[in-house]
Amino acid sequence: MLSHRLTLTVSLTLCYTPLAWTEDTPQAQLSNLLRRVNTMSATVQQLIVESDGAVLEESSIQMHVMKPDGFYWETLEPFPELVVTNGAVLWNYQPDLEQVVIENWDSSRAELAAELLSGRTDSLAEEYEIHIEKDIGEDMAVFQLLPLDQNSLYRRINISFDNTALLSIHLDSKNGQKTLWQFNQPQINQQLPPDLFNFQIPTGIDIVDNRVSQD
């Protein structure tokens, strides 16, 4: 399945009207920012920092999202890897290993990223205490999610919007590790080919098929 870092990234999106603070709950405001987007493409810069401040990893990523469950996350540098799902099957392709791992995709078991990707944010209030910072600028919004589960890997999750655009996601782990995703050059509601989310397996590579029959 997706790594913990990957399952808590990605799929936040944009809306088409400027931010306007209302009496809505933070959960409702976050949902409003997500619900109007059907597709999103962006380049993502990933930075992972250890508890002592040392940089563990810097990555360049290409991301495509298509509701309800299309997800494409390709790490370009430093180590090529592709994770893609069409909502039924998940492929994890590692070209350096000449291997693809295939699994069932079950959005009901997915973590935060899949909920946000599909716009299913209703359960967020059951899993997180959601706050919003309103004092950082007229066109800025930062949502802070505090896990209610004491066994969560994360201390907090910050989701930042700049006016109508998703700016970044910041994960603060309990072990002191911090992960930052910076979203650049977003393209919203542009047509994406459905085949983008169906991985075509190259010839000559190893196939590890972990799918379980749904019958």
What are the language-model segments listed below?
Residues 44, 71-75, 90-93, 145, ...:
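Short hydrophobic/aromatic-rich beta-strand segments that constitute the beta-sheet cores
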Residues 109-125:
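Short, solvent-exposed helix-to-loop capping segments enriched in aromatics
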Residues 20-24:
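Boundary at the C-terminal end of the N-terminal hydrophobic targeting segment
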Residues 62-112, 179-180:
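An acidic-aromatic
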Residues 25, 29, 34-87:
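N-terminal mature ectodomain segment of secretory-pathway/periplasmic proteins
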Residues 1-8:
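Bacterial N-terminal signal peptides that target proteins for export
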Residues 16-17:
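N-terminal signal peptide c-region/cleavage motif recognized by signal peptidases
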Residues 101, 125-130, 134-211:
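Gly/Pro-enriched, hydrophobic low-complexity segments
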